[in-house]
Amino acid sequence: MDPHVKLSTSLVIIAFRYLPNNFNDSRLGCDNLSTVGLCLKNGTGEVLFSGLIKQMANFYIFPLLLEARSDHFYEGNEYIKYLSHRIHGLRKSLHITQRGGKPKSSVDKRYAEILLFNADRAFQQFVFLRSSQRRHALRRLKRADQFGKELVSFTNAFDCNDHIFYLEAIAFAKYIEGTLNYEKRDWEGSLSAFSISRLSFLVLQNKIDTLAEHEKSVLGELQNQIDSNLRYVAQRTGLQNQTKSLDILMLSSIPKDEEVIQHVNSVDSEILQMTGDEQDSLQTITVIEWRDQRVKIEHPDVVLALYAIHDVKNSPGTIDSKRDRLLAAWARAEEITKSVLDNTGLEDEQKFQTLSICYTYLAYNVVLLRIQRDLAVENDSELVASQAQLRSRQSLYDSIIKNIEIAKELPGIARDTGMTAQLEAQISLAKSKRCQAIADAYQAQDKLASLAMCVRAASYLQQVNDILRNFEEKPHLIAFDIIPELKKDEKELKKKILLLQSLASMGNINQPPKNLSLVETLDSYQTLAELEPSWNLTDADIRAIPAKPLFFDLAITYLGQQTSFDKKKAQPEKPVTSVSKEPKQKNKGFFSSLLGR
């Protein structure tokens, strides 16, 4: 398509987004935005972007909200200021700026954007002030709830037949209402509001392909938060709601006369039908099968953890988007079961045995999910064949080996010889793959080192064969499907070893002759041609060890340690003794000397 035509069509899409609902133009042959794409043609009569315009007409609120939250990467007060600027700009464009504190409204569809941003701004202020100023934060949350209800009323009055527009508004407004009831400890009201919000999100899930990837991630986080809040509120409302799946809990908490039911029936009526198969599947959530053992879990905390795993598995979204949440749910269930098991005495042996089997089952699945997540991340990696990719593969296999070692130490596996043998085979296969990754890294630099690592990898594969030779069970898929991987690695490794052996031998042939040292050539006869270069006395593989000659030892024995033979020994200085001098007699006078004599 001509890029000018594409650009002009995009401008037409943007322009028609802000047309009023009663817009009519005979040249286009349409009466609202949802049918513009079907009539937009070029000079030859070809329809341009009909599907794209129709998809943009489906969603109105979600793209605005997700764009504001994700495109600009604002946080805290910056995002609140951004919403204030957006609200002020919309009011100026609609000529409804407030003067004197009197609010004004409009019948234009863009007025829904003002209500949406006002509600989101008040809600973000609640989140920002929640920990420091709770009373003020609750006032902002009530204000957000008021704007949300006004948004729902506006969408219903604007076009009661636009079901997607209404469901977008009710999903956002009921989420705020559920949060308000949650803060007020009104569990019944919070359960009903969160259920309506979740139902609206599930209906809109079929249309989510029209959003961008980053918008899908933001919307997925909002849905996950609704699911976790709904499960917690169900736990606080009573035991009758704790053992229900989120779908059954959601449908049982919504009154039949709710207006949202009519809109849901108009868009997707099948979502309101609960089949018997799902009812039966709920009975198997608390039944665990592990290594020919089947137990039923009855402890309430462990049961709730198992239902949380079931909720994440059945939540909307792809497997890749749910992988981290599923791993967190399994880890949480393992932690709860471990705590309950530690507090359980050995008096009730049956209960202790049941919890031990449950703990082994959960811990093993946590290890399994970690390995699968690491493998999926490595497969999705965009690194080209380089040293960085080889290092990443080596760290991946190190992580797999550590996780399998953790699984081997679990109480229910350490005494199971069959499961231990499978884990040992998986460890040996992972070590073989790690050696192959190291060999690939050394192949360009050192062929012999690469060949040595390949030989070691082959020895690990031989260990796998030895383990599986007497193994009668069908191996489980833990990190690898071990039998196909073993056959493939053996075939590739043989080719690689032959290639490296040939490359190493060619390198030895092309290598220049080594200049041997004198010690290395003493026991061989060399021709004159071989002796043309000077003898190498230093670069020898056999190094001389410095030692004192024998006559030095004899001389030291008879003469003592001599530092210098041409100099006389220095005479030791005698200690100086102090000699006391007699004091001189004073000269006497004439008469004194005469008398003295």
Curated annotation (Swiss-Prot):
Gene3D superfamilies: Signal recognition particle, SRP68 subunit, RNA-binding domain. Its main location: cytoplasm. InterPro entries: SRP68, SRP68_N_sf. Residues 566-597 are annotated as: Disordered. GO terms for biological process: intracellular protein transport; SRP-dependent cotranslational protein targeting to membrane; SRP-dependent cotranslational protein targeting to membrane, signal sequence recognition. It is found in: Cytoplasm; Nucleus, Nucleolus. The keyword RNA-binding applies. Keywords: Cytoplasm, Nucleus, Ribonucleoprotein, RNA-binding, Signal recognition particle. GO terms for cellular component: cytosol; nucleolus; signal recognition particle, endoplasmic reticulum targeting. Pfam families: SRP68. It comes from the Eukaryota. One of its GO terms (molecular function) is endoplasmic reticulum signal peptide binding. Component of the signal recognition particle (SRP) complex, a ribonucleoprotein complex that mediates the cotranslational targeting of secretory and membrane proteins to the endoplasmic reticulum (ER). The SRP complex interacts with the signal sequence in nascent secretory and membrane proteins and directs them to the membrane of the ER. The SRP complex targets the ribosome-nascent chain complex to the SRP receptor (SR), which is anchored in the ER, where SR compaction and GTPase rearrangement drive cotranslational protein translocation into the ER. PANTHER family: SIGNAL RECOGNITION PARTICLE 68 KDA PROTEIN, SIGNAL RECOGNITION PARTICLE SUBUNIT SRP68. Belongs to the SRP68 family. Heterodimer with srp72. Srp68-srp72 heterodimer formation is stabilized by the presence of 7SL RNA. Component of a fungal signal recognition particle (SRP) complex that consists of a 7SL RNA molecule (scR1) and at least six protein subunits: srp72, srp68, srp54, sec65, srp21 and srp14. This is Signal recognition particle subunit srp68. It comes from Schizosaccharomyces pombe (strain 972 / ATCC 24843) (Fission yeast). The gene is srp68.
